């Protein structure tokens, strides 16, 4: 299945149903009181994380989703039915962003997590709500409020413990194949990897971590060169970044310059991502002698002004790979992922009682406004007709 990590969709919550103006009419009760019911609330739109999905491809073809409108109120004090909610399933790791305001609505990082992204409209009030001692035949009602509507940007960000960085052909995919059961394509030309891939590395029977491989970066990637930096977002949730460097590039480029290129592109993309723990790993030492590989690595570090804190490995032969994996596992266990603070659902400021009282209080009646038979039923010939109260 094609890997799609971005989608733009239109979501519309249901409008609230309108209130009803009605009067009770039965045999022997020709002048009954008001019995118009309230409308129903509009349906909401939710996102739910599903671990069985791994792409947003479903939302590349169907882009518009609308919840059901609440039904209007009816006579005999019947309340309209609430509109049905709709729930959209997305992969675990999806981020929801309002496309107009660029506000991040939330991240779905656990299976089964549910998030409200569009709230349905509130119901309108029927004329029975406006009955009082001085207004016994009310002709007022309120309409339901509109539901929320927004363009929603969905971004899938892979959940991995370790992220791989490096130029094309640095050996990232070979490393993933060596430490996990993942089988990304490996070839001797740049940009063999076109989409991110995940692999699970087992250090022993009870310990493992997830590693992510993304397409290689090149100079100018932040400006769109190569495949750009769009895949770097998949590394934002990693514990540690592994910067894989070809210690003896076939194009005879300087590894120190190659390291600087990646660091520069990281800072161009996100300073927060650039400041994540990043380990320097020199790969392809199998084509050099041990002494030559060590000397070359020390020379590179001296020119970079860094400490002698690096690894020398060969992903092709597996040399020193186990040591690196164990150190990664120890680091992850010593620095557990900080759980996102559980934010209690904010108390809904909209209170039905307050809303009803506010709507009713806007209508002030005096005895002078009432006829002696004001309690009487509403006549269809009444010139004044129905009064609809609109929320300012």
UniProtKB/Swiss-Prot annotation:
Its main location: cytoplasm. Gene3D superfamilies: GTP1/OBG domain, P-loop containing nucleotide triphosphate hydrolases. Its EC number is 3.6.5.-. It is an enzyme of class 3 (hydrolase). Residues 361-392 are annotated as: Disordered. Signal peptide: none annotated. Keywords: Cytoplasm, GTP-binding, Hydrolase, Magnesium, Metal-binding, Nucleotide-binding. Mg(2+) binds at residues 173, 193. This is GTPase Obg. It comes from Histophilus somni (strain 2336) (Haemophilus somnus).
